[in-house]
Amino acid sequence: MSKIFVDACLGKETPYTPVWMMRQAGRYLPEYMKVRAEAGNFLNLCHDPEKACEVTLQPVDIVGVDAAILFSDILVIPDEMGMDLSFVKGEGPKFSDPIKTQADVDRLIGGEEAAGKLTYVYDTIKLIKERLAEDKALIGFTGAPWTLATYMIEGQGTKTYNICKKMMYSDPELLHNILAKVTEVVKYYMEKQIEAGIDVVQIFDSWASAIEPGKYDEFSWKYMVEIADYLKSKYPDTPIIMFPKGIPAFIERGLVYGNFDVFGVDWGTPMALAKEKLGDQYVLQGNMEPCRLYSKEATTECVEAIQKVMGGKRHIFNLGHGILPDVPVENAKHFVNECHRVSGKK
């Protein structure tokens, strides 16, 4: 059976514009909170294929999105590379021993060995594929090497990225060595996700905006393109979505390139600009400001504006970043319904 989401990713004509939401399997859903409480904590939920499968399917069943996205976390990669991930309540993810030297890099587990330890992810994918409706697609994902490296070097989330940037400008070779090692793991990780059954790949560069535009290609984009090239060489029919958040200047200068299918547009980048610069080359995904979900009227206004720009061609509806935990479920449903309405779903 044809999957409308996969067709849309490949730029094919579809009867309406499909929609999903970043972080759609998450805290705004009471059903998710119940399963998370049963799991004990966030990491336990990631490591439990049965429960991770359940929360992956929830937004498809409850909200009506056209694709499921695997429930996991980008930081399971450095965790299995040997970095000892923990989640501290109220503070987020932490690594107890951040990378400071080449010796730290050399100690990390690399390549296929690290990717091979993520069996719980592949088991989750297989379970989801058994239970997901045939007309719905499953999105697998990874963090971009730069975004992963920020946590590995800083030891936690950061607003300034000063430790990473100090390395970028004072010891770029060390940073490139970290990025290269992470890139190799990501290649094998995404290959194994595809082999397990995902239909589409998304690469999240959540902290792309931390890099000045003139350095973005060198320290992030080229590594994302390397991953896409590797996957396309083996799985040419598997669509790849790139989502670098907060790089309008990079887009405006015409610096985006690479062998991928869909460009995810964040809410801070005008859709008209993305269409002008990228619309002929890539399908565009996005880009409603997530806080509009607090108001059904604001949601409808934005959905109609995006539809006016894109005209239902070479487009996938999404938010311009993740859905927030206190959004009413009814408003999330309204967003999905409005995306379907304006694009002509019967």
From Swiss-Prot:
Example of a GO MF term: uroporphyrinogen decarboxylase activity
Pfam families reported for this sequence: URO-D (PF01208)
Cellular component GO terms, alphabetical: cytosol
Lyase listed as a keyword: yes
Localization, UniProt: Cytoplasm
Keywords: Cytoplasm, Decarboxylase, Lyase, Porphyrin biosynthesis
Residue(s) at site: Transition state stabilizer: 73
Any single biological process term in GO: protoporphyrinogen IX biosynthetic process from glutamate
Enzyme Commission number(s): 4.1.1.37
Reaction it catalyzes: uroporphyrinogen III + 4 H(+) = coproporphyrinogen III + 4 CO2
Major subcellular site: cytoplasm
Binding-site list for substrate: 23-27, 73, 151, 206, 321
Pathway, per record: Porphyrin-containing compound metabolism; protoporphyrin-IX biosynthesis; coproporphyrinogen-III from 5-aminolevulinate: step 4/4
SUPFAM superfamilies recorded: UROD/MetE-like
NCBIfam families the record matches: hemE
PANTHER family: METHYLTETRAHYDROFOLATE:HOMOCYSTEINE METHYLTRANSFERASE RELATED, UROPORPHYRINOGEN DECARBOXYLASE
Subunit structure: Homodimer.
HAMAP family assigned: URO_D
Function: Catalyzes the decarboxylation of four acetate groups of uroporphyrinogen-III to yield coproporphyrinogen-III.
Family label: Belongs to the uroporphyrinogen decarboxylase family.
Name recorded for this polypeptide: Uroporphyrinogen decarboxylase
Organism listed in the record: Sulfurovum sp. (strain NBC37-1)
Upper lineage: Bacteria, Pseudomonadati, Campylobacterota, Epsilonproteobacteria, Campylobacterales
